[in-house]
Amino acid sequence: MDADIVCVGFGPASGGFLTTLSRAILNEDGSTAIESPSAPGLPLQVLCYERADDLGFGVSGVVTRARGLRVSFPDLDPSQIPMAAPVAGEKFLYLLDPVGASCRPALMRVADTAIRAMGGILGVKDDAMELPWTPEFLDKHGGLVLSIGQFNQWVGQQVMGSGTVQIWPASPVEEALVENGGVVGVRLVDQGVTKEGKPADEFTPGMDVRAALTVVADGPVGPIGRQLDKAFGVPEGHHTHDWAVGMKFVVDLPESCDLEPGTVIHTLGYPEPEIFGFFYVHPNRVASLGIFVPSWFDSPARNAYKYLQHWMLHPAIWRHVKGGRLRSWGAKSLQESGRRGEPRLAGNGFARIGEGSGSTNVLTNSGVDEAWTTGVMLAEGVLEILKNKQPFTAENLEAAYVSRRRKSWVEKDGRVAERARDGFQRGIIPGLIGMMATGLTKGLLSMPGKPAPPHQRVPSLEEYYRGRITPEEIQTIRKESEAKGISTHAALMERAGWPAIPFDGELLVSHQDALLLGGKVQAPAGYADHVEFLYPHDCETCGSKICIEMCSGQAIFPGENGRPAFDREKCVYCGACLWNCCKGNPKDSEKGLIEFHAGAGGLHSAEN
């Protein structure tokens, strides 16, 4: 099959690209403005393949300054987008530890004692202290609270309604077609295969779609982006060592909650100092609330779902949500290297946009608006190339797209933020000092630190729990958990002092039950497993198995002899397993022992 332009992935970046491009393909009278080189006489042929089973499935809620979005939609009315609201108020809370179980550094414990002693003066309430101001670099005043799933569906409807673009959900892309040092299209995944990928009944080989330009927007864990990194390399000094899992609940707020739509709450300090929280209020008494668990949180038993429940039970959060109902939930890997994670942005026949192109601002904690704007800039460059009847060569794309990006606010702000997170390699306090220094000096000062691949910094369970749980107890918990086919984090956390979660079946539900809520997690038959354990014996002898602990959907679990096993029916496609591994790949010191391929299924909710 032939096309002119093929896009991989439909997220904010593709949304910006296709919105801008589609507006220029036809004239106002409906006649063709840009003719297709591959199908003369027809308008430009543009296809977009999305892995998830529908548009907007499996992405997240967000607060954004909406700088780029408002350029694309100058008359934007948030009320036309489900779950959207203007930012009405914003505050930053430092959460004290109400249960005494978090692993806080000594200086933070001293500070906590002082804060409690001066609670009346500092306005401490519900074991939380509101900071007197939100740092300017985090301030989202004038922005929007969005459900990106709902926003993507809204954008997709407009793009497809133009009649100039085809978007195909439930269409994972297996690989880019690389020929003669360039990309000439994509190949979709095989269907009708066993979990091992072998042909079965109704086998259908993946279709080749050839195009003059392939736009890669498959996110930070996308297999096509990683394929191009391997094929063409990344700029010297660039890396993708810093990651986080963002996990959130979508909650129906109780009648007692008086938070107005557009309220934004940021938190730090609990359940562990390294974990940051967010609380965004949508219209109609709905809220998105969740946490970010970073790769520099050196716990081999880190589990976002369990920590999210403990965070929600903090008195400062619980008072707003008690009596509410969990509607749905979701999780996503976030590329936290920012501009230093930027790959090669363009080559012969291809261009990279979005989070996987290093657009996330790691100082302002924002990525949606930046991703959208990279898509807009590529579309503007593509239209320039088409107008001049030039081919999509690396040279032409560099001139029309990359140079445009280098002059943009995305680039300028990204350079300011580039070193903002380095201090976290030294600990939470140096990290916070470094972020403040970077923000206040516009990038002139920062706390030095050298990010390392996650597998090089994760300690063993025995090292992490030294002084709190004996090695003998850890071994007992490990064996008992393996025998039951479950992860160890729940037993380890309770043994370390964390209280059991008081499940109520409404707001506090078990991880297993959450898989059935809202957009039920499911996977269609006839596709191969997309998680592969490259060296099973090494996985079997691994003492920590952080891939099991961190799995957002319990899709990775202890199998035979404790070896990690994978259940595609539970996978939410967050990609956490790609960077949560305790052992280095013998063939690539930057990688772990897990490969994450193109796959179907996952979350079935456009709220997440």
Which residues does each predicted region cover?
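Active-site-proximal substrate-binding core of FAD-dependent oxidoreductases
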Residues: 39-43, 358-364, 370, 376, ...
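Ferredoxin-type iron-sulfur electron-transfer modules and their immediate structural context
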Residues: 82-85, 93-96, 122-123, 410-560, ...
